[in-house]
Amino acid sequence: MRNWRWLLLVLAALLAWLQHRFWFGPGNSGEVRMLQVQIVQQHQENERLRQRNASLAAEVKNLKDGDAAIEERARSELGMIKPGEIFYRVVEDIPVPLPNDTSADHGVDLSQPRREKR
């Protein structure tokens, strides 16, 4: 009977030690969950980078093989035009508010007559 008590005490102490290591020791359950979250985030980042690499590889292939991509880049990024082409720049007009338009009040009282400087 006495041996059973010692065995039970040793098993309880072993169980307590294992539980302590599981919850508070190195590699505990909190750290494991945190690492699992980091793994998921890293997988997402890796997938984003894979897609970016594929896009860049396609762009490099297109630049090596096609003249259209080179021409598009030269036009958009460097502002180049072909010989003989005429470049037109379209400039949008700034809308002028009407005298009775209160939505476009720019701090000017339109009800007062305008004084001209001499």
Swiss-Prot record:
GO terms for cellular component: cell division site; cell septum; plasma membrane. GO terms for biological process: FtsZ-dependent cytokinesis. Residues 103-118 have a biased composition (Basic and acidic residues). Signal peptide: none annotated. PANTHER family: CELL DIVISION PROTEIN FTSB. Part of a complex composed of FtsB, FtsL and FtsQ. This is Cell division protein FtsB. It comes from Xylella fastidiosa (strain Temecula1 / ATCC 700964).
